[in-house]
Swiss-Prot record:
GO terms for cellular component: chloroplast; small ribosomal subunit. It comes from Melica altissima (Siberian melic grass). Disulfide bonds: none annotated. It comes from the Eukaryota. It holds the Pfam family S4. One of the primary rRNA binding proteins, it binds directly to 16S rRNA where it nucleates assembly of the body of the 30S subunit. Part of the 30S ribosomal subunit. Contacts protein S5. The interaction surface between S4 and S5 is involved in control of translational fidelity. It is found in: Plastid, Chloroplast. Belongs to the universal ribosomal protein uS4 family. This is Small ribosomal subunit protein uS4c. InterPro entries: Ribosomal_uS4, Ribosomal_uS4_bac-type, Ribosomal_uS4_CS, Ribosomal_uS4_N, S4_RNA-bd, S4_RNA-bd_sf. Signal peptide: none annotated. Residues 89-169 form the S4 RNA-binding domain. Transmembrane segments: none annotated.
Length: 196
């Protein structure tokens, strides 16, 4: 299954707030289908919704998500927490968390168009797994700095997670450590995703 490129607000209305998907918010009371879906939710439906939240928030395909669940399952720690740590340490997500991109799809585009350097080397793979003490910068040209500057100016510095630091003057971010579960910005039950 390929990456979702359709209307994003429909997904937000169905699954709830997905901060990485878009900055737009749906109008209140604009979902006429909500009336018909009242009643008891089945276990399968709950698990499917949690999985879809994770997929659409991080912009993953079904195969990528299965691969991350497989890697997390091999770890000795809690599978759900390892899964979230793997997803949060992706380069596109770290750019979004630093405020260098307004959304995760925007961060993917920055990486794909070769505007981002990790430890002084160009990386054009959005799923690149960052490690502690990685330094993330932009290219020295004006175009790359301009793209990041707009996003940094509009981002809220109070929402920066504790495992990241950013230097807004030099457009440089640093990964300090691996993320704790409490700093994940998504309200999700990761155990239901693993069970699915």
């Amino acid at each position: 299954m390929s990456r979702y490129r359709g209307p994003r607000l429909k997904k937000i209305r169905r699954l709830g707030a997905l901060l990485g998907l878009t900055r737009k918010t749906p109008k209140s009371g604009s979902n006429p289908k909500k009336k018909f879906h009242s009643g008891k939710k089945e276990q399968y439906r709950i698990r499917l919704q949690e999985k879809q939240k994770l997929r659409f928030h991080y912009g993953l395909t079904e195969r990528q998500l299965l691969r991350y669940v497989y890697i997390a399952g091999k770890a000795k720690r809690s599978t759900g927490q390892v899964l979230l740590q793997l997803l949060e340490m992706r380069l596109d997500n770290i750019l979004f968390r630093l405020g260098m991109a307004s959304t995760i799809p925007g961060a993917r585009q920055l990486v794909n168009h070769r505007h981002i350097l990790v430890n002084g080397r160009i990386v054009n793979i959005p799923s690149f797994r960052c490690k502690p003490r990685d330094i993330i910068t932009t290219k020295d040209n004006q175009r790359s700095k301009g793209l990041v500057q707009n996003s940094i100016a509009s981002s809220d510095p109070g929402k920066l997670p504790k495992h990241l630091t950013i230097d807004t003057l030099e457009y440089k971010g640093l990964v300090n450590k691996i993320l704790d579960r409490k700093w994940v910005g998504l309200k999700i039950n990761e155990l239901l995703v693993v069970e699915y």
